[in-house]
């Protein structure tokens, strides 16, 4: 899946190929050329995105087409179902990211309160998680449009930022426990908000977390693997293999929130240990004897609570933030010197 918003290294299965037929560039508006180039070879499964060079490209005004409201810059990332572009809103100069995604033949649609028409699943999920009160830890959907063969999403583009994977690489692949706790609090809060609003992200990982390197503020992005949260089990896995819950491997099914808890455990382990958990480490965690030199007892205990192989023994999603590791957490803004203290 293509990331809903990736500013650094968008992951996804590449489906590139030389476009076989394009309209004459001198006569066709840029947004129409883009749509044609992106979707003309859907049947053949081969397409190539046109590359816009710089923000000087300005599509003609057209109130019927959302793309006419923005200038386009470089490609931020692309994958099997579309491309994310750097953009700027013509109305006020706001920097945005524009995702243009082609629709698969079995495109899922949903209906949500306040929107009687069918919505593309990813659009609907983002609308749900962006209900008021909005939370800064989840990327905001600013605008969207549904077309017969593709849908378009305009999302906020914070600056400065990088994805968490790139950020961790600056520190030899491991974060200090205090920094990891700041990150973990924000990601867990975002996951709780998603759950409370009926959304299952299903792909919480470092590449889908944007971090401001100055303030350490986090944003959860890319709901392309998401689904509506339900009480019954899911029998199809959509996400990243390294974060796949063990119950899906053994039973072919999983429940939403316990799977989210597992992915949060993998994320925390990866941040503070520098690698994904090995089978022997998971066995030690399951038996309660795992420990990591240099980490606090509370951090090790939380990891053991998160990475229980049996989902019935796993900590509940709503129980993570009250854990003793988060009893007092200070989040300092490097830009304005303000300090916000979270106590649980």
Where are these regions (language model features)?
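Catalytic-loop of the protein kinase fold
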Residues: 195-212
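Juxta-kinase regulatory segment immediately upstream of eukaryotic protein kinase catalytic domains
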Residues: 2-65, 73
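Activation segment signature within eukaryotic-like protein kinase domains
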Residues: 183-184
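Conserved N-lobe ATP-binding subsite of Hanks-type protein kinase domains
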Residues: 83
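Conserved end of the kinase activation segment
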Residues: 247-258
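Structural motif in protein kinase domains
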Residues: 158-168
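Terminal C-lobe "cap" of eukaryotic-type protein kinase domains
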Residues: 309-313, 317-333
